[in-house]
Amino acid sequence: MRTIFIKLLIIILPVACLVAITNYRVDPANIFSSSEYIGGIAEILSKGHNVDNLTNYDERLLQEQMVKRLHKSPDIAVLGSSRIMEIGSDFFPGKSVLNCGVSHGGIRDLVAITGLLDSLGRLPGEVVIGLDPYMIGKGGSSEWESLSAYYGSFLHKIRKTGNRDYDHGSPIFSRKLSSFFSLDYFKSSIDFVARRHSKRYLDVGAGIPLSGRFSDGTISYPDTYRNPDTLKVALDAGITGLKNGLPQPDSVSMGLLNELLDFLQQRRIVIRFVMTPYHPEFYAAINERQPLLFHYYETFVKELGVKRNIPVTGGFDADSLGIPRSQFYDMYHCSKAALVKIFRESDN
């Protein structure tokens, strides 16, 4: 029995070492090199330069590194999910803007990023908040935990209770440990090398990134994403809407939103709500599957705006806003041209 064990060990150990070394060295998702990778990106952005050729990275940790490198508070901070990540300095001429949008962003992201800005003394004079059903509905991503220390610090400050050092660092450690010997990650690493992909980001100065970030934090999507097959997008939007629906309203998330608004308004920070439209086929499918749910969310945002004297821009219905189907990257994201139209008509 002992001999068999030793033979198995002789076979397994080299394979395990090969997997671990490959995963660590190639690291296509920047699981092990996240700090160095993100720090380099933030350093370029802090110079007022744009950065290109970005691969997988933790967008929340990038926000932290960007804010840490700010020399002064921005005039405007844009908070929300990826649906607002193209709203930048060109929307507000003459003002400094920091886009703090993150993919799959929820209310806890807004709280954590506000806690980050406050902790580092970089609260802006104005905040633009992108609100939608996924922001204040049930469920959502746990990605906000990358900034859990700031989330906990913020709640401790406003509630005067709880743990100010609230931290969920263990999931990050667990992810690193599991990825070290993961065969799936090994496969991704081999595929990354075989396709000759590169993790080398580029400082393009004032040039337009093909797939990266502008110096104000806004995203530069690749051409293939900005110019999709519109028929396929429409088909996918309808199918997904009928299949998945929208999350139901969440009283806890709505409560957090109100606590956040209290904090901002007590500090006389100007607030503006933004609702960006969904693809018309997705909107129609949701109304068929969950009648009046979109209407509920839009009414909630508008009434909250009236109650708190906060202006509201946009809406969820693309047709009512005059946004054509051709101005959607996918079912969730309208184009920058559509965003410009929404802001322009709101300001007139």
Q: Could you tell me what each predicted segment is?
A:
Residues 110-113, 251-258, 290-301:
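Well-ordered, non-membrane alpha-helical segments in soluble/globular domains
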Residues 25-43:
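Alpha-helical transmembrane signal-anchor/signal-peptide segments
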Residues 144-267:
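Secreted/periplasmic serine-hydrolase-like ester/acetyl group-modifying domain
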Residues 42-72:
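Short extracytoplasmic
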Residues 289-348:
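C-terminal regions of proteins
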Residues 6-25:
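Hydrophobic membrane-insertion alpha-helices, especially the h-region
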Residues 263-289:
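Active-site segments of SGNH/GDSL-like serine hydrolases
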Residues 70-164:
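Membrane-embedded segments
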